[in-house]
Each structure stands twice: as C-alpha cells, then as structure tokens.
Amino acid sequence: MEFSLLLLLAFLAGLLLLLFRGHPKAHGRLPPGPPPLPVLGNLLQMDRKGLLRSFLRLREKYGDVFTVYLGSRPVVVLCGTDAIREALVDQAEAFSGRGKIAVVDPIFQGYGVFFANGEHWRALRRFSLATMRDFGMGKRSVEERIQEEARCLVEELRKSKGALLDNTLLFHSVTSNIICSIVFGKRFDYKDPVFLRLLDLFFQSFSLISSFSSQVFELFPGFLKHFPGTHRQIYRNLQEINTFIGQTVEKHRATLDPSNPRDFIDVYLLRMEKDKSDPSSEFHHRNLILTVLTLFFAGTETTSTTLRYGFLLMLKYPHVTERVQKEIEQVIGSHRPPALDDRAKMPYTDAVIHEIQRLGDLVPFGAPHMVTKDTQFRGYVIPKNTEVFPVLSSALHDPRYFETPNTFNPGHFLDADGALKRNEGFMPFSLGKRICLGEGIARTELFLFFTTILQNFSIASPVPPEDIDLTPRESGVGNVPPSYQIRFLAR
C-alpha cells in the first residue's frame, strides 16, 4: 500500500476517532517528546524510511530517553548503550514485560514464550531453557548436531561446482534443521517439499514484518486491520506454519513414550500431562504451538540472516576473509572439522563474527518491552504497562564504544595484544531478563557454520568489492540483507 494512501487512511481515522476520544491524556511523568496530535499521535514526525530513522532523528532533539505516541499509545524510546543498560540490566525486573508487535498480535495474543508476561512467561522460559539445555547434552550435543549439518552443507555446496548461487535457501535450511532436530527430533532433506514450504513462509513473513507497511500498521492497527495489507498475508503465513506444528504435535502425542522423550515437543507433552489437573497451568496446547512457532522462527531467521550478511561482508572485504582463513589453517587445519573449543584460540575469527552481528544490526529497535510497575527512570516516572522500545541499533553504532561505528572493523572487539575483548555496546541478542533464550545455540551455529564454510571454500562475487551494496532490502523490525550471488570454490 502506497505511503500516501496509508497516510490518508490514518488521517481519516484520526478525524473519526477524535469525535469520540479527544486528545491523548497525560500519562505519569513521561520523558519529553514531540507533542502528539489527537489519535494520530506523532505520525507527522515519522520518517518515510521507517521507525528507526524516525527515532534516531528525534533522539537528536530530545536526548537518549524520550516518548513518542504511536497512534494514541505512548511508547518510551531508549537510545544509546548507557540508557539501554540502565533499563534492561540495572532495572531488569521493572523492564522485563513484553509489549506487542501489532502485525503478529492476532496470532500470538500474549501466548508463547516470547509474548507471554508475568509468571506465565517465567515458567515457559525456565522450561524452554532447561529443555533445550538437556537436549544439548546427553544424547547428541547441539555442537554435534551443528557439525553434522555443516557436513551436509559442505556436500551441498560442492555440488554447485563453483557456479553462482543465492545462498538464502541453503542458509535457511541449515539453521532451521538445527532447531528442527531439537524441537521436532528430526532434520529435513534440503529438497523436502514440506520443509521448503515452511522455509518460504518464514522468509516471506520476516520480510513482510520488516516492511514499511508493517511499521505503518504498528501506528494504527485497530483501524488498518479492516483494510487489505501485509498484515493479512503475515497472518495467513503464520497460521499455515501453526497448522504444520499442530499436526506434528498430534503425531508426537500418538507415539509418545514417557520413558524416552525424543525432543522438546515430547517433554512439553509430558509436562502438560503432569499439570492437566491445574487449570492455571501455563503448559497447555496453545502455549505449546506458539512457543514452538517462536523457537522455529527465531532459530531459523535470525542466524541464517546473519550468515547471509556475513558472507556479503566477506565478499566486500576479501582481506578479512583471507585473514580468517589463515587463522583457520593455523588452529584447525584441513583434516578435521571445526569444534567449539577452537573458538577460544581464534580471537580474530571470533571478532569478525561479532562485527558481522554488530554491523548487520539484525533487530534494530529490539523487541518491545513493557514496564511491569510504575518505574522511576532518569528522573521520570513510566507508568505500569507502558511499552518501551530499546533501540539496539543505537548501541551497536554507539561512537562512545565503537571507534568507527558505521564501518566494518573487527578491531572493535580486539585489544592491543590481539585478544578478544568485551564491548559494552555489543547487544545483538538484547540484554536483561528478556535476552534471547537461543543466544548460546546461535553463537555456536555462527562460529561452526562460518568456519566450516571458509575452511572448505574460497568465495567470489561477480561484483567488484567496492561496488557491493550492503543496504538492507527491508529495514523495520528486522534488517533484511539484499539478495546477492556468490561462488563457493572448493579449496
């Protein structure tokens, strides 16, 4: 939908609703921000290039903590490393609530481990962390699963014989198979039609959720939901994925062996059975479906997109690629696969992966938080249930913590001796009590897939390095890298 039409619809909505609701009311003692219009909120301050651009521009005038009105609802925006850490770490409990993402709210409605709140969320998060940890130990470790998948990926890339290809589908396949092995107890063949359909739905949905239309929908969901738009396609896509998950759950239920749980779904079904007499239990069918959807979506999209962006950066900066491959040769060699223990001996490669995550800036303004009580913060009072947007991008590009914030520079994560150093501005997985629960798995995947590929292949592009464009194809809730062609040449 064109911006002008969206603006017209929003303006008409404002005129109609103004007759019934009047001006936005004052809320506590919120941080300063641009004065909102009735119902329209700060629509006129929103940049056509999206919410991130809008927030960064408003930051220049109002500072690191300010309030914007998305429609009639106030949202507190946090910018910069220090403000985000003060909120999510120093006052972790107060800022531990989860806000809504309007385009997916009709699906989740506050259920599942990502969108749940209060004790429901705590119980689901504890369970999810413990279950993934248990399936990362015992039987087959997560590391072994990733190494197996990396071997399959190398075999598939060898089949290309150095021809140009788009790595999107392959990277989606390998990262998805890791979470599939933990959640569903199986991996899929890369040509499996059901698997390919699921991957297409995830890729479509991530791109649509990150689109400009979805950002406009965030301002006026109650009104725009009555019109055609990306929100309807997102709903259909996620419903189709949920149908697949539901069918898989029923197959698990029919073959469940209580003495030998095979995967996350089995363990959850056993917990459901244990709690079936408790009507207040969080462990019910709907939370199972939506928690699996969350794990599947996050476990597929975020890591695969980081890998895609990473190899685009390696094409643009071939001298970095050469240095990574030299470190791989020195530490690992060519006769065994990379292992997680190698990471501690490979500070340059680890720094490169950190810098890929930093500059890739996958989730620019993070997932929405919500304060769980009236909260004093930097001299203001944020009322209970107010949404909070931590702009992670502003930390990942914070000039106080990164010397060249807009340039690819692995030195941001290396000390004078070449050892890996911690950087307070690095928060791609967010911080605090809502930090990504798959952080450990994602970091392991990034290291093992990245090093295995560069151990076995040189890479080349039909485009000269200086002409490679890093501009995201979509930039909203997520940054979607541009499509590109790459050759994987066996070493």
UniProtKB/Swiss-Prot annotation:
Cofactor: heme
Gene: CYP2B5
Entries under SUPFAM superfamilies matching the protein: Cytochrome P450
Family as reported in the entry's similarity comment: Belongs to the cytochrome P450 family.
Membrane topology classification: Peripheral membrane protein
UniProt keyword annotation of Phosphoprotein present: yes
Listed EC numbers: 1.14.14.1
GO molecular-function terms, A-Z: arachidonate epoxygenase activity; heme binding; iron ion binding; oxidoreductase activity, acting on paired donors, with incorporation or reduction of molecular oxygen, reduced flavin or flavoprotein as one donor, and incorporation of one atom of oxygen
Compartment(s): Endoplasmic reticulum membrane; Microsome membrane
GO cellular component: endoplasmic reticulum membrane
InterPro entries in UniProt: Cyt_P450, Cyt_P450_CS, Cyt_P450_E_grp-I, Cyt_P450_E_grp-I_CYP2B-like, Cyt_P450_sf, Cytochrome_P450_fam2
Protein name (database record): Cytochrome P450 2B5
GO terms classed as biological process: epoxygenase P450 pathway; xenobiotic metabolic process
Keywords of the record: Endoplasmic reticulum, Heme, Iron, Membrane, Metal-binding, Microsome, Monooxygenase, Oxidoreductase, Phosphoprotein
Reactions the enzyme catalyzes: an organic molecule + reduced [NADPH--hemoprotein reductase] + O2 = an alcohol + oxidized [NADPH--hemoprotein reductase] + H2O + H(+)
Functional description taken from the UniProt entry: Cytochromes P450 are a group of heme-thiolate monooxygenases. In liver microsomes, this enzyme is involved in an NADPH-dependent electron transport pathway. It oxidizes a variety of structurally unrelated compounds, including steroids, fatty acids, and xenobiotics.
Modified residues (Phosphoserine): 128
Protein residues bound to heme: 436
Gene induction: By phenobarbital.
